[in-house]
Amino acid sequence: ASLTKTTATLLAVMKLYDQGQLKLTDPASKYLPALRNTNKKNITIRELLLHESGLVPYIRFYRNAIDEYSVTGPFTQGFVDEWHHTRMGEYTYACSDFKFRRGLVSATKTPEHTLKIADGMWLHRKFKAAMMKSIVQSELARKRFVYSDIGFILLQQVVESITGQTLDAYLVAEFYRPMGLE
């Protein structure tokens, strides 16, 4: 995910900046109506890029996708046992036999499942709105450097709002296809 921040989101933001379609001093709320009447309405594009927006470092969105009754014990923990053997990080192991909430994920693209998250895995389109709601409701701290995934999720939304395309489609059209990288 950190690589995507610099090779995808940042690339798109730089292009839109060069084209005069956004300014670093613009509040993200200019492009994201969900932020307008919140404590996040004045967060600027620059603050998001520099991780100085006051946003929380991360939100565990996956928790909203997991059927809590399909998990034995906690979903993640710091050691391997018979239920937790999928390594997610250096000291983090996930429950390996969980199930997604009913209707949230599909093996094929459908009118409701439009967000591709992996080959053969499509997420319900409403999950993106639920993620934004979690961001809007999250705490906002003092504006100082705190590495945050949330800022780059918002930058992705800004790019998509300006271009009218998904970040993936915009990058393919503006960068990858012209460079012969499809």
Predicted regions and their residues:
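Short, charged N-terminal helix-start/capping segments
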Residues: 72-74, 79-81, 155, 164-169
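Generic preference for hydrophobic/aromatic residues in regular secondary structure cores
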Residues: 135, 151, 179-182
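Active-site-proximal loop and beta-strand segments within enzyme catalytic domains
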Residues: 1-147
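Active-site-proximal alpha-helical segments within enzyme catalytic domains
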Residues: 48-51, 151-161
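Short, well-structured active-site flanking segments
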Residues: 14-33, 162-182
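Internal, well-ordered alpha-helical segments in soluble enzyme and binding-protein domains
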Residues: 127, 131, 151-154, 171
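Hydrophobic (often cysteine-bearing) scaffold residues that line and stabilize catalytic clefts
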Residues: 4, 9, 147, 151, ...
